[in-house]
Amino acid sequence: FRDALPQISRIPAPKPGFKKYEDGRLRPDGKPGFNTLSGKLDFFSDRAAKFGYPGLPEYKPMTVLSKEFDLRLMNGSRKPYITHSKTRTDQPYLMEIEDCLHVNINPRDAEARGIKEGDTILITSPYGGPVEAKAVVSLIVPVGTIDAQYGWLDNQNTQKLMNRGNRDPLSGYPSYFENPVRIEKKA
């Protein structure tokens, strides 16, 4: 093995164990406690409050679905062989494994829309679309939800379905898991 990879080096793994907070394995300074300003579990963030954000998490209800957009899109699932569009489209072998966007849809939702495994579907949201994908009928997603990979381009790019105005105020992260959409079988 070392002959095949002469540049490889070993890095010792951290010692496994329980109660790492007791002996300083959670903090860069080696002191006992948690890796927070106080060294304790912080339920209220003084740092967030200092900058005018809520010190405690606030519940916000999800975007309400409508008759027209009656499914919720979870955008951002990943497959180990497709990380970003660059790694996929530059690799013919990866395109042989999966050559287009696949979207998981619950069997009940698929049946209600006349969609079968492998059908080409169009996804539209109040913010954009349509996005073209192949249907994967699966119990992996609950009723009322579809699940799409990210990283596809052009007419398969799910980013155009996102609500750009609905972001977490502290991190700026978009609401990738609650966008209302509708799907239909492509004619």
Please report, for each region that a protein language model flagged, where it lies by residue.
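Long, contiguous, secondary-structure-rich segments that constitute the structural scaffold
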Residues: 1-11, 88-104, 108-187
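Long, low-complexity segments enriched in small/aliphatic residues
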Residues: 1-91
